[in-house]
Amino acid sequence: MTIAIGTPEEKRGLFDDMDDWLRRDRFVFVGWSGLLLLPCAYFAVGGWLTGTTFVTSWYTHGLASSYLEGCNVLTAAVSTPANSMAHSLLLLWGPEAQGDFTRWCQLGGLWTFIALHGSFGLIGFMLRQFEIARAIGLRPYNAIAFSGPISVFVSVFLIYPLGQSGWFFAPSFGVAAIFRFILFFQGFHNWTLNPFHMMGVAGVLGAALLCAIHGATVENTLFEDGDGANTFRAFNPTQAEETYSMVTANRFWSQIFGIAFSNKRWLHFFMLFVPVTGLWMSAIGVVGLALNLRAYDFVSQELRAAEDPEFETFYTKNLLLNEGIRAWMAAQDQPHEKLVFPEEVLPRGNAL
């Protein structure tokens, strides 16, 4: 008698079927990360388009901020809630709006809606890169690199206002609104003199320089695959083998600077390291500002400038500019504080 011994087929459940459907090879990959990314990105972008088109900032900032009121793509914004809302999540069904959509928009509920959905959407996009990299056997450095922009977004739009008195002090979602927030950061925190800002600028501009140098060097050292006179005819874009000479590039930069990258791994790691580290440093600096930490204070120069009218440095001049920014912005931004400044220090009309 023959007895066949085999392993019974495992029963597939709903989770297995869902996993198969989510991770199926299709034109646009969905994946488990898509369950977070796609709805959050949809709601964040949709909320921003709705707010910039229809919703006023009159009740929160005393401003016009929508296309309906005459703004354009550079001046429209979804503005932050009023300072009196503090750190309320401003849920549509919460005690502030009580289910009234119009009132919710007037109070600034769209801003918290966009900020929270936008944060989770960015995190979902990073998880998407992890998931696809894992599926096809890549290292996860793309996702790690994307943590740089995420850290900046979260620190500026969420952590900074959490350290202040309310969401009011976060940037509104608009081009001119972001510019205004940058001026605010300078006036109230002297942000340009902050070492973390300096590292961020060095990282971002250094990365731009590295990209330009790298792209130009690769184009300069392409292997010719034809007799064309220009780059676009001199090689076949679908050729399987390597297309440029690292040895030639190394020799060129060795002659220019005396040093050069010896291998591609170190070169490309450096191109990853510079911008991502710069963004992380900026995010750390903004977290410090959330706690109102000071940066550099050159008190000796301030004291000497106060005593000697002929002594002035770019640092002391910038401090006076910062005082002007504070005097102008505070009274406009926070009318409920009833801040009063002497007439001689305030601007007249639109004159700077």
From Swiss-Prot:
Keywords on record: Acetylation, Chlorophyll, Chloroplast, Chromophore, Electron transport, Iron, Magnesium, Membrane, Metal-binding, Oxidoreductase, Phosphoprotein, Photosynthesis, Photosystem II, Plastid, Thylakoid, Transmembrane, Transmembrane helix, Transport
Location(s) in or outside the cell: Plastid, Chloroplast thylakoid membrane
Binding-site residues, Fe cation: H214, H268
Bilayer-crossing regions: 40-60, 124-140, 152-165, 207-227, 278-294
Any Pfam family matching the protein: Photo_RC
Residues binding chlorophyll a ChlzD2, per UniProt: H117
Cofactor binding summary note: The D1/D2 heterodimer binds P680, chlorophylls that are the primary electron donor of PSII, and subsequent electron acceptors. It shares a non-heme iron and each subunit binds pheophytin, quinone, additional chlorophylls, carotenoids and lipids. There is also a Cl(-1) ion associated with D1 and D2, which is required for oxygen evolution. The PSII complex binds additional chlorophylls, carotenoids and specific lipids.
UniProt modified residues of type N-acetylthreonine: T2
Alphabetical list of InterPro entries matching this protein: D1/D2 (IPR055266), Photo_II_D1/D2_sf (IPR036854), Photo_RC_L/M (IPR000484), Photo_RC_L/M_CS (IPR055265), PSII_PsbD/D2 (IPR005868)
Residues that, per the record, bind pheophytin a: Q129, N142
Function in brief: Photosystem II (PSII) is a light-driven water:plastoquinone oxidoreductase that uses light energy to abstract electrons from H(2)O, generating O(2) and a proton gradient subsequently used for ATP formation. It consists of a core antenna complex that captures photons, and an electron transfer chain that converts photonic excitation into a charge separation. The D1/D2 (PsbA/PsbD) reaction center heterodimer binds P680, the primary electron donor of PSII as well as several subsequent electron acceptors. D2 is needed for assembly of a stable PSII complex.
Subunit description: PSII is composed of 1 copy each of membrane proteins PsbA, PsbB, PsbC, PsbD, PsbE, PsbF, PsbH, PsbI, PsbJ, PsbK, PsbL, PsbM, PsbT, PsbX, PsbY, PsbZ, Psb30/Ycf12, at least 3 peripheral proteins of the oxygen-evolving complex and a large number of cofactors. It forms dimeric complexes.
Protein name per UniProt: Photosystem II D2 protein
Originating gene: psbD
